[in-house]
């Protein structure tokens, strides 16, 4: 009585199919698949966003920054 055989599970599956209908079960499977795919894409997007933010230019020039080489060449 502790474990169910394959026949018990087949009977349960047939009853569930009769109650909900195969179309409803198929649409639930599709919805679950879309949810899993959306979750995976969301997790993949989390990894991509910090890499894009870190790709900012490493040198930031402000108005007070002077390029010495350019200044020396213009004086020569």
Swiss-Prot record:
Keywords: Cell inner membrane, Cell membrane, Membrane, Protein transport, Translocation, Transmembrane, Transmembrane helix, Transport
Composition bias, Basic and acidic residues: 39-50, 64-76
CC terms in the record's Gene Ontology section: TAT protein transport complex
Source superkingdom: Bacteria
Membrane association type: Single-pass membrane protein
Region described as Disordered: 39-76
Compartments, record wording: Cell inner membrane
Chief place of localization: membrane
Record Pfam families: TatA_B_E
GO molecular function: protein transmembrane transporter activity
Parts of the chain that traverse the membrane: 1-21
Keyword Transmembrane helix appears in the UniProt entry: yes
InterPro entries according to UniProt: TatA/B/E, TatA/E
GO BP terms: protein transport by the Tat complex
HAMAP family: TatA_E
Family: Belongs to the TatA/E family.
Function: Part of the twin-arginine translocation (Tat) system that transports large folded proteins containing a characteristic twin-arginine motif in their signal peptide across membranes. TatA could form the protein-conducting channel of the Tat system.
Subunit record text: The Tat system comprises two distinct complexes: a TatABC complex, containing multiple copies of TatA, TatB and TatC subunits, and a separate TatA complex, containing only TatA subunits. Substrates initially bind to the TatABC complex, which probably triggers association of the separate TatA complex to form the active translocon.
Protein name from the UniProt record: Sec-independent protein translocase protein TatA
């Amino acid at each position: 009585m502790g474990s169910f055989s394959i026949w018990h599970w087949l009977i349960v599956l047939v009853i569930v199919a009769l109650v909900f209908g195969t179309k409803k079960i198929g649409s639930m499977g599709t919805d679950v698949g879309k949810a899993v795919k959306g979750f995976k894409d969301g997790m993949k997007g989390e990894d991509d966003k910090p890499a894009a933010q870190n790709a900012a230019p490493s040198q930031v020039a402000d108005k007070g920054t002077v390029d010495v080489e350019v200044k020396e060449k213009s004086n020569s």
